[in-house]
Amino acid sequence: MVEWTDKERSIISDIFSHMDYDDIGPKALSRCLIVYPWTQRHFSGFGNLYNAEAIIGNANVAAHGIKVLHGLDRGVKNMDNIAATYADLSTLHSEKLHVDPDNFKLLSDCITIVLAAKMGHAFTAETQGAFQKFLAVVVSALGKQYH
């Protein structure tokens, strides 16, 4: 079980209460698909992912990026039981979609980068530490079914 300080809980809640899902979600997923092109294989039904411009302008990529961020809301609301919160998604991604669990970490890094760029100086070391801890716990939960 993960131990959360009151400060970490506050930081994470504050980040998500001010999150611009429509901006950060599409940018983060686009960045992941561009920087790590092998992750595109899981999105073949999304249409044209031929180059960076096509990925950035792809409505399906944008919608899924938003969906992913809203999926993180579930973890924020259930910080004391993140593993159980994502158990079904872990099963889906491992048994049906066959997603490499390392891709969750790559996407979490992209989310962090895009959020940091958006927040600027407000993305302090303390904020980064709490946010990355949260994402690491979610990534671990999503990878549980693989173990």
From Swiss-Prot:
Which residue range or ranges hold the Globin domain?
Answer: 3-147
InterPro entries, per database record: Globin, Globin-like_sf, Globin/Proto, Hemoglobin_b, Hemoglobin_oxygen_transport
Q: Name one GO molecular function term.
A: heme binding
Q: Is Metal-binding found in the keyword set? A: yes
List cellular component terms (GO).
blood microparticle; haptoglobin-hemoglobin complex; hemoglobin complex
Question: What domain of life does the UniProt record list for this protein's source?
Answer: Eukaryota
Reply yes or no: does the keyword Transport apply.
Answer: yes
* List of residues binding heme b: H64, H93
Q: Which GO terms describe its biological process?
A: hydrogen peroxide catabolic process
Function noted in UniProt:
Involved in oxygen transport from gills to the various peripheral tissues.
User: How does the annotation summarize its subunit structure?
Assistant: Hb1 is a heterotetramer of two alpha chains and two beta chains.
This protein is called what? Hemoglobin subunit beta
Q: What is the lineage of its organism?
A: Eukaryota, Metazoa, Chordata, Craniata, Vertebrata
Q: Which gene encodes it?
A: hbb
